[in-house]
Regions:
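An N-terminal assembly and electron-transfer interface module characteristic of large anaerobic redox
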Residues: 1-182
Length: 182
């Protein structure tokens, strides 16, 4: 295996293959941990009669510097926060998508929207940045999925957030909608 990037480290092919296998195993462990936490959060919500928000976004949206502490704002309103990757595997997406579902993140997002649509105490807030080209397709599709279940779609464009005042109003409106629907 001739990889010039690693030449100075003198790794053998066997060492590189072993490292890749260990990395894949750890990645699977990480994904399983996320799913376990999602199930624990849902159980906690049910046990304590709480409502929750699935905060769906790209991995970099979990960075507090990027998301401006939206997760903290939501929990401060008495709601639980879950991520789309913590619940997407529980979905049985039967909704007919009008887009080609070829990207892992998009597939996870559609599955999460479908799962949220079937839950009475969950809503989904989609975080988006920079008007990302391929992500633009997801906003319409996620909205359609949620609306097919009578749920309100909330999109927060992270790069347009200067302060959390407007976000707070949107989340409170979503919470009021949840209570009204109950």
């Amino acid at each position: 295996m001739d990889l010039p990037e690693f030449k100075e480290y003198n790794f053998t092919k066997k060492e590189l293959i072993q490292a890749a296998k260990k990395a894949e195993k750890e990645y699977q462990n990480f994904k399983n941990d996320i799913r376990t936490k999602g199930r624990e959060a849902l159980e906690y919500m049910q046990k304590h009669n709480l409502k929750g928000i699935v905060l769906a976004g790209r991995p970099y949206h979990t960075d507090p510097e990027v998301n401006h502490g939206i997760d903290t704002l939501i929990t401060g309103l008495g709601l639980c926060v879950l991520t789309e990757d913590s619940i997407a595997d529980m979905a049985t997406l039967k909704y007919r998508l009008r887009v080609v579902n070829q990207w892992v993140y998009h597939a996870r997002l559609y599955a999460a929207a479908d799962f949220v649509g079937k839950q009475k105490d969950l809503e989904l807030v989609q975080l988006n940045s920079f008007g990302c080209g391929v992500d633009a397709v997801t906003t319409d599709q996620v909205e359609e999925i949620l609306e097919s279940y009578g749920k309100m779609y909330t999109l927060i464009k992270i790069d347009e957030v200067n302060n959390l005042g407007a976000v707070r109003i949107r989340i409170r409106s979503l919470l009021a909608s949840m209570k009204k629907r109950k």
